Amino acid sequence: MGLRNRSQLKHKRCFFVTTTCNHWYHIFDSPPFFELISSSINFAAGKYNAEILGYVIMPNHLHFIIIFNEEENQLSNLMRDLKKFTSTHIRRLLQESGKEELLKKLSYQVKRQKYKIWMDGFDDVWLGKREIVETKLKYIHNNPLQPHWALAEKPGDYPYSSAGFYYLERKSDVQLTHYLEYF
């Protein structure tokens, strides 16, 4: 959804959100990156009084389903803060892991910004019915299984997703709330 339409959804509470690494580069390729994204999602959800119903962190993008506990959602503010905070720490992780070639590709000299980790903006889809939430959860959980990714054989095998929480009752690094508590 384009930014100009977000004001129409100010009083909606549940969204499927996608944000992507700049140029679709595969940045998230080791546990420190996944841990950073997981802990950052937890912090942002707590700061904006929201709960995460599902997620997947892929090598070059992430999806999550979020529900806000306030009358007005703060999705744009949450995403701004999440991307700003993670950008700084992702850059540090890239430097520490010696990924100078990738850092060169991410170089970006505009104003005070030296590297561009995330693409501008994000995509969001309002989820108003249980069936739609279930469709998006299925999509999230099957994303790592797609032939072009081949990151897992079964949804619950991929550790950076809510699939283990839903299918195997496994604890997740991202603090999750079961969608049936709301739908």
Question: Which residues fall in each region the model found?
Answer:
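Short catalytic/metal-binding and nucleic-acid-binding patches
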Residues: 1-183
